[in-house]
Amino acid sequence: MRILVVTATDAEVAALVPSLVPAAGRTSRLRSYTHDRHAVDVLTTGVGMVATAMWCSGVFARERYDVVLNGGVCGSFRPALPPGTVVHVTTDRIAEFGAEDGEAFLTVQELQLLGEDEFPWTCGRLVNSVPPRNGALDQLPVGDAITVNTVHGNEATIARVVERYNPHVESMEGAAFMYACLVHGVPFAQVRAVSNIVERRNRNAWKLREAVDALGAALFAIIDRS
């Protein structure tokens, strides 16, 4: 099986890569490995939606994969998903995609600039309706995500986004990854490990090492059982 792991930064897959065997065909962004009978490429896109969409689309246009995994860290809006928890994100949306109207916010769909179900959107969200069949993936809790350019760290804006979308987690790349996969018809799964609770910015409370270790273990299990 040919598998692609997409990540924003090398640090987020630092616990996965040592479990793979380096192979030929490595570049600065797209590195090749093997595990058992699988060929595993790792694409490092850089942080944010623009970089993720651009590099994913470029690779998808010239390469074919049996499954694509997005591995990264995220912030959690739910106490039931504490740092170190790995989540299978099956729906995502771009939280800031719209316009301000005084104190109100209008989504791009509410502005009638984009249809609620205009491909690849479903009811204003990006939905992975047919994730890969994988025993390790099936064991993960499923969550709804938002993708942002500005990570939340203000109590008022956190309250507003929870009221509007009620998300489980947030990241800076997930929706762009899902958009590219849906457009290109690539089987995919977005897998994220919680590094912090979404609250007023408090780096001392973050558990990045625990999140990266948990993410690496989860991604390796998915690859191993593919």
Functional labels for PLM-detected ranges:
Residues 40-45, 144-147, 191:
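Active-site-proximal beta-strand elements of phosphoester/diester hydrolases
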Residues 1-57, 63:
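N-terminal short beta-loop-beta anion/metal-coordinating cradle
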Residues 148-190, 195-199:
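A C-terminal functional module that forms or caps the active site or interfaces directly
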Residues 77-165:
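Mid-sequence, gly/pro-rich, charge-dense loop/helix-turn segments that line enzyme active sites
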Residues 14-17, 78-80, 98, 157, ...:
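Short glycine-/acidic-enriched loop or helix-start segments at secondary-structure transitions
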Residues 66-69:
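Structural motif
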